[in-house]
Amino acid sequence: MSEMRLIVAGAGGRMGRALTRAISETEGVVLTGALESPNSELLGKDAGTLAGLPANGVLLSADLWSLSANADGIVDFTVPQATIANVAIAAQRGIAHIIGTTGLSTSDNAVIQSVTDRAVVVKSGNMSLGVNLLAAIAKRVAQSLDDSFDIEIVEMHHRAKVDAPSGTALLLGEAVAAGRKIDLATHSARGRDGFTGARKPGDIGFASLRGGTVTGDHTVIFAGASERIELTHKAEDRMIFAHGALTAARWAKGKKPGLYSMADVLGLGDI
C-alpha cells in the first residue's frame, strides 16, 4: 500500500508539532502539508524545524485548498471554528478528516455530520488506546451496576486548556450514559456551586480541574453504598494522541463515507 499523504492542521501548535514528530517516526504516512491560521506569525516556517526535527521542506500555509490537492487526509487538533472551516474543504476534496478538536458545539457536530454521506470522518474526544479502552470498560461497568451507584467523572488538565469538561470527559460520559441507556444531555450535572441541594438520582456528574502542565488525567467513579469503584487513565505525553490519530488516519484510507470513532478504529465495539 502506498504511503498516506497527510496534512497537519494547527501545525505550529503543541499538538501540531507532536503530529509532525509522530509522522516522522511512523511508517506508511508522510507529511505533505502544514496548515496554520491566516494571521499566524509562523506562516512560511518549516514544519520540521518547528517540531524540533531537521527541516523537511513543508512550509506552514493558510491555504487548505491548495495543500489538499495532493493529500489523502488531514489530521485536525485545532479549535472549533477552524475545524468547521476545514470540514467543507476536506469533504470537497474527498480526503479523510481525522478530528481531535474538542469544545465542538451541537451545531458544529451537525455540520460535521452533514458531510459524512460523501466524506470519511473519524472524530474522537481522545485518540489514545488507553482512554478508548477505559471508555469501553466504563460502559460495561455502567451496564452491570444499577442506579444505586452514582457516577462522577473527574478530569484535570494544564492551565492553558480553554474548554471544560474536556472532550475526553464527555467521551467517557457518553460511554457510561450508553451503558445506562440514558441521554447524557438530560442527565449531566456540571459546575456545582453553593447550595445545590441533594444529588439527583441518575445524574452523571462532571468536575474539571486546571493547573500546571498536566497532559490529561481522567477518573470515572462509581460510588455505591459503602463501596466505590474508580477507573483512571493518566496521559503522560501528548504523543499518545498523535500516534492514535495516525492509526485512525491509516485505518480511514479507503473506507466508505461515514462518521467513525476511535472505537471503530480499534475494534472496541463489542467490549
Swiss-Prot record:
Signal peptide: none annotated. Disulfide bonds: none annotated. It is found in: Cytoplasm. (S)-2,3,4,5-tetrahydrodipicolinate binds at H158, G167, T168. The active site is at H157, K161. GO terms for cellular component: cytosol. GO terms for biological process: diaminopimelate biosynthetic process; lysine biosynthetic process via diaminopimelate. Pathway: Amino-acid biosynthesis; L-lysine biosynthesis via DAP pathway; (S)-tetrahydrodipicolinate from L-aspartate: step 4/4. It is an enzyme of class 1 (oxidoreductase). Its main location: cytoplasm. Catalyzes the conversion of 4-hydroxy-tetrahydrodipicolinate (HTPA) to tetrahydrodipicolinate. Belongs to the DapB family. This is 4-hydroxy-tetrahydrodipicolinate reductase. It comes from Rhodopseudomonas palustris (strain TIE-1). The gene is dapB.
